[in-house]
């Protein structure tokens, strides 16, 4: 909301605001709403869900159905570091992946029968490390007080980064498919995921996206660099539907942003 709170921070005490925002989005012509679910709000232990949060999610799904909006359900959030349980950060890689699979199984079970689910986004901006990271340091640097980037491993060992990403995607998609065989699955990729010189996430779309139903990229065009943004976007067009899941005139003028959106239509099939 305008105070920077996540949905889970106020949907218990201020449900009227949630209903108001959904009605406003519908009037504005939106058809998909992206929601972010934090691990700390939905798991009380690696294998125990927060039933109260699941009930509130069901209420939100009913609201979406009634309003005529679809949900992009983005999970495994750790945006507020203070809300991340210590037990979660202390898990080994395999234990953490198992907890993440349990999370998604619980969420998908809640969503499976609803016509209001657009997709499951496995995680916002996951990254595979190069080499070995610091114990417990699963989050990337904060931006505006929130941690948007997460590591799915803390130790590359001798493994190709893309293979780690593929195995992680496989484990989580398999967990969802145990309880929901029909809704779409994707993952929100940073724009520096392409196989090219410089910073890379390890999630090369042409290598890791086989089990995803469509590709999502987060792309913020920069002033005077629209050609670069379109070239980057084109790199994510790998033969699957391509959605720009995040974009905004953060680094360019509104006029340039309009140009970017118009030009992106050649490659993208949706914008959130």
Residue spans for each PLM region:
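Histidine/acidic-residue-rich catalytic or RNA/ligand-binding cores of hydrolases
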Residues: 198, 226-230, 253-265
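Mature extracellular/periplasmic domains of secretome proteins
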Residues: 203-208, 231-236, 260-266
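P-loop/Walker A phosphate-binding loop and immediately adjacent motor/lid segment at beta-alpha junctions
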Residues: 174, 227-250
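Active-site mouth of glycoside hydrolases
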Residues: 1-214, 224, 247, 251-252, ...
């Amino acid at each position: 909301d305008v105070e920077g709170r996540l949905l889970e921070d106020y949907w218990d005490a201020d449900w009227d605001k949630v209903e108001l925002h959904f009605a406003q989005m519908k009037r504005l012509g939106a058809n998909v709403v992206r929601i972010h679910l934090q691990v700390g709000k939905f798991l009380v232990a690696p294998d125990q869900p927060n039933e109260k949060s699941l009930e509130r999610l069901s209420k939100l799904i009913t609201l979406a159905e009634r309003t005529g909006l679809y949900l992009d359900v983005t999970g495994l959030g750790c945006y507020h570091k203070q809300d991340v349980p210590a037990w979660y950060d202390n898990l080994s890689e395999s234990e953490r992946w198992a907890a993440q699979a349990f999370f998604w199984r619980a969420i998908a079970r809640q969503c499976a029968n609803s016509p209001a689910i657009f997709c499951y986004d496995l995680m916002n901006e996951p990254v595979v490390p190069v080499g070995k990271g610091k114990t417990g340091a699963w989050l990337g640097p904060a931006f505006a007080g929130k941690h948007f980037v997460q590591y799915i491993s803390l130790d590359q060992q001798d493994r190709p980064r893309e293979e780690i990403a593929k195995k992680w995607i496989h484990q989580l998609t398999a967990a969802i498919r145990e309880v929901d065989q029909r809704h779409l699955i994707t993952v929100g990729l940073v724009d520096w995921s392409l196989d090219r010189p410089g910073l890379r996430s390890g999630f090369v779309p042409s290598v890791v996206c086989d089990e995803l139903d469509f590709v999502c990229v987060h792309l913020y065009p920069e002033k005077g660099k629209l050609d670069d943004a379109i070239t980057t976007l084109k790199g994510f067009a790998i033969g699957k539907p391509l959605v720009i899941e995040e974009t905004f005139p953060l680094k360019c003028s509104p006029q340039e942003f309009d140009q970017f959106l118009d030009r992106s239509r050649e490659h993208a099939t949706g914008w959130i």
